Amino acid sequence: MKVQQYRLDELTHLVKGELIGEGSLQFSNLASLENAEVNHLTFVNGEKHLDQAKVSRAGAYIVTAALKEHLPEKDNFIIVDNPYLAFAILTHVFDKKISSTGIESTAQIHPSAVISETAYIGHYVVIGENCVVGDNTVIQSHTKLDDNVEVGKDCFIDSHVTITGGSKLRDRVRIHSSTVIGGEGFGFAPYQGKWHRIAQLGSVLIGNDVRIGSNCSIDRGALDNTILEDGVIIDNLVQIAHNVHIGSNTAIAAKCGIAGSTKIGKNCILAGACGVAGHLSIADNVTLTGMSMVTKNISEAGTYSSGTGLFENNHWKKTIVRLRQLADVPLTQITKRLDHIQAQIESLESTFNLRK
């Protein structure tokens, strides 16, 4: 298969950059600084990468004007204000796109479902009653859309995904393999030593430009809907419980768990393995560092952390012993000791000043 080539001047135009060098050069792909060859385009995202750039074999470099001045031995550049953003834009040029349309013969589609003529439905896909699939949407093999599910335009649903509970996805949503959208929420009523299952009657609403990684679970609401607003991005292995509401452009890294009925604001970042208890509210523009545990509301923007960072094992053991010893001492006793020490210090300072 012939590899698609792109001219340097064409690529420069796509990122609204300034071309320096030979615009007719042809490029077959993007590559990292260390692995780039002469037919590859690469980028330099900061001064810390200049040493790698100086020895790179790449045919051209995406850089800022200031970074270019440090690479006098190189000839071909795309000058932009933000090299990383330009790189992100150009990845879509070189990405291998699925151009097929139509429905594969092994797919099982209910007669009432409405499937766009420009959509692609892969092998062994099952689509239930009253479903809708929009224009240019791709649904890969072995995926299941239960009854009353709606998928918008330009979406990509990877293989082995299950979308159920009447979930509604808007446009340009990407969902990766083995994720479940709209599964039954974890709702039970305790009575006389037993757990009584609560039927989950809500759904899941997913906005535009949402990306969800593989092996995630996003449960439908018990009564109200679970909601992901526009631009939310979610890594692999994330659990979002019933009735959770996530604000626009919030990013959630792998292994996070969000308990039911919690509301997370806009433009938040949850780093890896964060846990958020249920029925809480987190303000806009909050960042949680890795493995943070949230057990109360966060009402102000900022960066929050919890837990103890890594250090040498013997040191850690001694620290834990001291923490336990500290926990055994009543707080009032600690306060009295500190007050006594402070009084002694002030007395010594006073005596020292008198002797002067």
Swiss-Prot record:
This is UDP-3-O-acylglucosamine N-acyltransferase. GO terms for molecular function: N-acyltransferase activity. Pathway: Bacterial outer membrane biogenesis; LPS lipid A biosynthesis. Keywords: Acyltransferase, Lipid A biosynthesis, Lipid biosynthesis, Lipid metabolism, Repeat, Transferase. It is an enzyme of class 2 (transferase). HAMAP family: LpxD. Belongs to the transferase hexapeptide repeat family. LpxD subfamily.
